[in-house]
Each structure stands twice: as C-alpha cells, then as structure tokens.
C-alpha cells in the first residue's frame, strides 16, 4: 500500500486506514476515490467516523469544498447505509458543521442522483500496483543518499505486491458544476468522534507514497496524519529538501560546457 497502516490509530482500526486516493476524469465528471481497509476489506466502514474528500479551489491548501460520507452500523447482512453531504465555505473546514445531503444509499450499490452525482461504497480489488524490488531500491536510495540501483529489477518479471487483495472503497463521480473550478487540489481524511464534542483526525492521504518515501516518522506518523496540508511546508519542508538534496547528486551528472546530448 502507498499509505499502509502508518499511524498507531490506523493500525488499531483498519476501517480508518486510508491506503490510497485517486482523482481522474470520468465519463460525466471528476472521479474521487478513497480506498481504506487495506488487506482487510471485510470489516466495512466505521459508524462513528467521517470519511472526507477535501477540495481546494483557491490554491492555498485550505478546503473550499468537502464531500463527507458517513455510515451507520452494519445490518444483519453486513451491509451499511450511508449519507453523502456537500459542505462549502466555512463549513468545509468544520467537522461539526452540517452540509447539504447529496445522496444516500447502501454499500455495494451504485447510486446516481438527479443532478448526475454517482456514488459507490463497498469492497473492491486493490488497484494500486507496486513492485517490491523497485520500491525497496527507491527507499534504500533515499535513506542512503545514493543512486537508485535497479540492477536487480527485470521489467519482464515485475510482480504486484498487492495482486489479488481487496480494499474498501468510496467512489464519487461529481459533475463539474458541483465543483466550481477547473483546477483543484484534493486530499482525503478519516476522523473519529472523540465523544467530547470533537473529532480526532486519524489518517490523511493524497499523492501516493509521500509519507513512506520521505519517512515522516522523523516527525512522527501520528503527527503527520493529524495535521493539514497548509502546514506541510513548515512541518516537513526541511525534511523533504534534505532527502532530495542527498539523492539528486548521485543520480545526475554535471553538464559539460558546450556539450550536447545525442
């Protein structure tokens, strides 16, 4: 997984563990995917949690729009009912705020609303492809500040570490008019009711492998998962710069004056 059980709370309850987030153009809108429950997708969704897609339309790493999915406890057949809310403005950053209900349904069913929103929540095959030899080589290079050594990798023998495994997925397809911007920033979070009027953010995820490759354990995975993207530059900028600076010299060569590439 690109974001697999990287906090103590996520390890305790994989229903709150985000493995990957995907964003792409669909047939009739933008598709948002949040995968959770890596390697244990039969546990469903937590009934006291918020599963949220945060959308930044202002290029300031602050949500202007949030799609929130909540679930009720599992029924005797194992399925759960869910509600999708849309929150805008100040409500998009307030977990105690109420939004406009966009859709409702049950897990394992595709729901399509009159305004074109499509929703699915349920089990799915894990689409994340990762070859163990390649990721080990990259992690070793970042750790040691050395060139990436792929001498042991044969592309013809590439093997997916997660072939045949499942996740629990939340998939939204949202028409452009409900997003309101052509360029957006997106991340997903899970948060758990603390029973004291607040919410404890358990996991966050956006681009794959960021927390794994750059080893944010130096600052603490739990700290990373509890913070927001708007604070990343201050919290993790030096860490990322240091690791990239150590890796770049061994993997590049200085240009020769007057030389041309052939």
Model-derived features: where do they sit?
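Surface-exposed extracytoplasmic segments
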Residues: 1-262
């Amino acid at each position: 997984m690109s974001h697999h059980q990287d906090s103590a709370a996520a390890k305790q309850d994989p229903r709150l563990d985000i493995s990957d987030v995907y964003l792409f153009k669909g047939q009739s809108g933008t598709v948002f995917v949040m995968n959770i429950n890596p390697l244990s997708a039969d546990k469903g969704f937590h009934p006291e949690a918020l599963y949220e897609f945060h959308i930044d339309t202002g290029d300031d790493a602050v949500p202007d729009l949030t799609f929130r999915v909540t679930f009720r406890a599992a029924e005797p057949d194992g399925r759960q009912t869910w509600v999708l809310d849309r929150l805008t403005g100040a409500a998009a950053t307030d977990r105690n705020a109420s939004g406009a209900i966009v859709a409702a349904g049950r897990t394992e069913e595709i729901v399509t609303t009159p305004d074109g929103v499509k929703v699915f929540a349920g089990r799915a095959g894990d689409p994340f492809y990762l070859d163990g030899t390649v990721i080990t080589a990259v992690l070793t290079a970042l750790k040691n500040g050395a060139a990436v050594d792929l001498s042991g990798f044969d592309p013809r023998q590439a093997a997916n570490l997660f072939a045949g495994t499942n996740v629990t997925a939340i998939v939204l397809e949202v028409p452009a008019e409900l997003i309101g911007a052509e360029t957006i920033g997106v991340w997903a979070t899970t948060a758990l009711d603390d029973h004291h009027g607040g919410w404890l953010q358990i996991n966050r995820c956006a681009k794959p492998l960021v927390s794994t490759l750059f080893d944010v354990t130096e600052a603490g995975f739990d700290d990373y998962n509890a913070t927001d993207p708007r604070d990343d530059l201050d919290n993790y900028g030096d860490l990322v710069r240091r690791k990239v600076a150590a890796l770049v010299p061994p993997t590049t060569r200085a240009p020769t004056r007057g030389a041309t590439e052939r």
